[in-house]
Design a protein with these regions (language model features):
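Sequence-level detector for tyrosine residue identity
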Residues: 15, 31-34, 124-126, 154, ...
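Residue-identity detector for glycine
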Residues: 3, 28, 33, 60, ...
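Conserved ATP-driven motor cores of ASCE-family P-loop NTPases powering translocation/secretion/packaging/pilus
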Residues: 69-155
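Short secondary-structure boundary/capping segments
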Residues: 60-63, 98-101, 120-121, 160-162
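Short clusters of small/polar residues that mark proteolytic maturation junctions
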Residues: 57-58, 107, 157-158
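Short, surface-exposed linear patches
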Residues: 8-12, 66-70, 105-108, 125-129, ...
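Conserved P-loop NTPase motor module
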Residues: 138-180
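P-loop NTPase motor domains
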Residues: 1-70, 137-147
Length: 180
């Protein structure tokens, strides 16, 4: 289903983008000041557990792989933004990593995940990404943000979750207020 939805979104946005460009060109001289009337809105596609739909090339393909890779490579021009989440960057398709403008990574320790992060090290970075991740403070929520547009890497901290979390690890001993 993800492959079909991705392909359809891509095709629809390409058609819409062409119409938007024709509208803008027809307005000629006031091109920069012309506000395009969109028939289809710009799209954000969010995919959790992305390695399940975009596995590393060495593993093979899923029915969604080709459509998602096309969106990753060509989707920016027609107005499609993609947000992928995975806890295993070593298992995700190489294009998902190399086509990313922003990468947020918490501390990773598995060797394939560290290697995957180091593969996206850009020429403007003096240290490897794994060095940056390893130098993070050992606090919950610590992460790095790699911004390809500003060509910088930023340390960051994600605030604690305030809502119920279905994926939380079970506790053998119930947590009481006085054990915080």
């Amino acid at each position: 289903i993800i492959g079909l939805v991705s392909k359809r979104l891509f095709n629809e946005r390409m058609i819409s983008r062409k119409d938007e460009e024709i509208q803008a060109v027809q307005h000629g001289i006031d091109y920069m000041g012309y506000k395009v009337k969109r028939k289809m809105p710009l799209v954000w596609l969010f995919i959790d557990e992305a390695h399940e739909f975009l596995p590393h090339e060495s593993v093979g393909k899923t029915p969604a792989t080709d459509a998602l890779v096309q969106v990753l490579r060509e989707g920016r021009q027609p107005g499609i933004s993609v947000v992928l989440a995975t806890q295993q960057p070593g298992k995700i398709h190489t294009d998902a990593m190399t086509q990313s403008d922003i990468v947020i990574s918490h501390r990773v320790t598995a060797e394939p995940d560290v290697k995957a992060l180091n593969q996206i090290t850009q020429s403007y970075l003096y240290d490897s990404i794994s060095d940056k991740v390893n130098n993070l403070p050992r606090l919950k929520g610590s992460a790095i943000l790699l911004d390809d547009n500003s060509e910088r890497i930023y340390p960051m901290r994600v605030r604690p979750r305030f809502t119920w979390h279905g994926g939380e690890a079970p506790m053998a001993i119930p947590k009481s207020d006085d054990t915080d």
